[in-house]
């Protein structure tokens, strides 16, 4: 293996020293206030698998993120990764694969005007659900569609088509114990919390909920805490990064997110679960920086 126990200790120590030498300091203002906000929701740190930028086996990668304090990971599906290797790495390291991300939902959309494309997208969602079950995950993240034009893929069409296709996967999700988690992105489809509430509730199934990314939603003008409070128990998972209206995507803790209010809202709705970073990753140094920033915001050990 690349990371034996002594190696992990070395990585932690050397990375911490490197960050100090580089003059990294926790951002002030809202981020500093977030550290002092109480009560805090109980959150567990995770990363997207694609953020782990080292060469080596799945187990090597899992060992690295574990050495940096991450408890979980989210994989893509469908993918060409060796499923047996993933399961063995999970069991060997104790890293939790808490869910998967539908890897084809953006280009092979459930809202596409072509029924054949929608059928292929549905198979992708079903594969994601099956993989999530195999890995022991609880969710399959899905972007249900995209408003691409007014004639063939407008809001109403995206709503109706995606609802129809997702319904075809609900039975499998219920049988598998895996929930379909609807994520809101910059797809011009769902831009208000009330729309996401309605979209989820229209399925009338506990197997469908919301996957919320507070940074994505800053673009649409409604505070993240408002989204969280309106979603309430519908919120299954929580992604975060950093977004600034002035500078675009920034490092975690350097954006416009009102983290103290986000933490307060998470606690109010009883969200205690995974907090998954979705940012540019890298090697040990970059991943350690991400972990440190998450710890500063969420007060995690």
Describe each region flagged by the PLM.
Residues 2-46, 51, 55-66, 138, ...:
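Histidine-acidic metal/acid-base catalytic patches
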Residues 13-26, 37-39, 111-210, 219:
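Active-site acidic/histidine proton-transfer and metal-coordination neighborhood
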Residues 45, 97, 180:
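Hydrophobic anchor at the start of a short beta-strand
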Residues 52, 78-80, 187, 284:
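Short, surface-exposed acidic/glycine-rich loop or hinge patches that mediate macromolecular interfaces
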Residues 71-164, 216, 246-249, 272, ...:
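Structural motif corresponding to the early beta-alpha repeats
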Residues 75, 185, 255:
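Glycine- and other small-residue-rich loops at beta-strand/loop junctions that grip anionic moieties
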């Amino acid at each position: 293996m690349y990371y034996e126990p002594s190696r992990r200790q070395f990585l932690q120590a050397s990375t911490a020293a490197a960050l100090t030498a580089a003059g990294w300091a926790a951002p002030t203002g809202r981020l500093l206030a977030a550290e002092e906000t109480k009560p805090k929701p109980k959150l567990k740190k995770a990363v997207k698998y694609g953020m782990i930028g080292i060469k080596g086996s799945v187990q090597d990668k899992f060992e690295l993120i574990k050495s940096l304090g991450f408890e979980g990971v989210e994989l893509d599906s469908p993918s060409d990764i060796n499923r047996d290797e993933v399961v063995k790495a999970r069991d060997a390291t104790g890293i939790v694969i808490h869910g998967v991300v539908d890897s084809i939902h953006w280009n092979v959309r459930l809202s596409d005007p072509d029924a054949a494309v929608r059928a292929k997208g549905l198979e992708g969602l079903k594969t994601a659900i099956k993989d999530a079950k195999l890995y022991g995950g609880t969710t399959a993240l899905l972007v249900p569609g995209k408003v691409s034009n007014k004639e063939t893929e407008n809001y109403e069409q995206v709503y109706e088509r995606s609802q129809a296709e997702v319904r075809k996967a609900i039975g499998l999700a219920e049988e598998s114990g895996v929930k379909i988690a609807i994520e809101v992105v910059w797809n011009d489809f769902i831009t208000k919390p009330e729309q996401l509430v309605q979209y989820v509730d229209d399925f009338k199934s506990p197997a469908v909920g919301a996957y919320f990314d507070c940074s994505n939603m800053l673009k649409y003008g409604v505070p993240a805490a408002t989204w969280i409070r309106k979603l309430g128990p519908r919120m299954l998972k929580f992604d975060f990064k950093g977004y600034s209206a002035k500078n675009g995507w920034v490092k975690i803790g350097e954006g416009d997110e009102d983290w103290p209010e986000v933490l307060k809202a998470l606690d109010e709705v009883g969200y205690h679960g995974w907090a998954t970073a979705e940012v540019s990753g890298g090697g040990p140094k970059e991943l350690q920086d991400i972990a440190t920033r998450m710890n500063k915001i969420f007060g995690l050990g």
